[in-house]
Amino acid sequence: NDIRHNLSKLHRNIEQVAAAGAQLVVLQELHNTSYFCQTEDTDMFDLAEPVPGPSTGFYSELAAGYGIVLVTSLFEKRAPGLYHNTAVVFDKDGSIAGKYRKMHIPDDPAYYEKFYFTPGDLGFEPIQTSLGKLGVQVCWDQWYPEGARLMALKGAEILIYPTAIGCLLYTSPSPRDISG
């Protein structure tokens, strides 16, 4: 969980895609670190930060510096004992256009997110940006269609789900490894 290394890598990658003409950049779920929710570890709470906070300052500068709309996913510490998996959207000028706190929190052998996160309380409100209205939710929320429906009914033009699914490390061969 080398945050400085991850931020440096994210900065380089954002710079690359912005130079290639990207206007909207969506980072994966909980991108400041590797996905830590596969175990229950109280030390991981040290990774949480307020919103706004250090990471939002960093991403605000990137959005403004490259003139992009940027969607991030952060481990938010809202208050002592109150933590969220929060998507924060930055407009092209670096301002925080809005945020969404993940509502559907998985808890199974691969995802111990209920150990870390409280379900969100901000509802399903599209976020107005210079590119249009974004319907932002986070990962597991995509399996519950009512959020997408409510966002669309309220005018969302694009649905976005930062997700960590697909970046998990396999302990057995992946289907690609055994397909021959």
Which residues does each PLM region occupy?
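Generic structural signal for secondary-structure transition and capping sites
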Residues: 67-68, 132, 176
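Active-site catalytic loop in hydrolytic enzyme cores
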Residues: 49-51, 78-158, 162-172
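Cys-nucleophile CN-hydrolase/nitrilase-fold catalytic domain and related Cys-dependent amidase chemistry
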Residues: 3, 12-92, 99, 166-172
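Single conserved hydrophobic/aromatic residue that forms the stacking wall/gate
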Residues: 170-180
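Conserved protein kinase catalytic core
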Residues: 35, 105-108, 180
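Short, acidic/polar
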Residues: 7-14, 146-148
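Loop/helix-junction capping segments adjacent to catalytic residues or to phosphate/diphosphate-binding pockets
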Residues: 41, 145, 180
